[in-house]
């Protein structure tokens, strides 16, 4: 890893280390713990960088630190409420933890600001399908509103 080489002088390159690029390569290689270290070093070079923070959240997710991932995504969204990637990541962590109602606004926010490139198509499709499942979207393409508490059955009617 570049930080190791920099620390012990392994590489003859005395230029600045690209910790972010290194982190991406490590994530691609499935080395999430090592990637997390690189992303943290990248964050020192660019404090508060939303892109780096989102990569940190993804690394947390992959190593099972989902609470930290949720906190990190929420931090990104405090700084940039339009951060589509943070909405996407947070939405699916919430769905996974059974907080589906809380995930819906994040799925909608992601879809409102979704990237349009070919690489994002699968993610956009997945978000649309999940939102449709959570909201009971009909074939019209319009999203049905969530029922109000008054429209829900009483607690004793559920059992």
List each model region and its residues.
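Alpha-helical segment of the N-proximal tetratricopeptide repeat
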Residues: 12-49
């Amino acid at each position: 890893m570049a930080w190791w080489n920099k620390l012990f002088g392994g590489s003859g390159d005395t230029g600045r280390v690209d910790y972010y690029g290194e982190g991406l390569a490590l994530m691609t290689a499935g080395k999430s713990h090592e990637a997390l270290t690189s992303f943290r070093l990248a964050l020192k070079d660019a404090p508060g960088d939303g892109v780096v923070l989102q990569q940190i959240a993804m690394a947390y997710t992959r190593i099972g630190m989902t609470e930290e991932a949720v906190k990190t995504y929420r931090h990104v969204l405090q700084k940039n409420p339009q951060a589509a990637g943070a909405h996407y990541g947070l939405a699916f962590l919430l769905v996974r933890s059974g907080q589906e109602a809380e995930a819906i606004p994040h799925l909608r926010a992601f879809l409102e600001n979704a990237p349009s490139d070919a690489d994002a198509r699968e993610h956009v499709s997945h978000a649309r399908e999940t939102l449709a499942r959570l909201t009971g979207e009909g074939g019209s393409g319009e999203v049905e509103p969530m029922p109000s508490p008054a429209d829900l059955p009483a607690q004793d009617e559920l059992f």
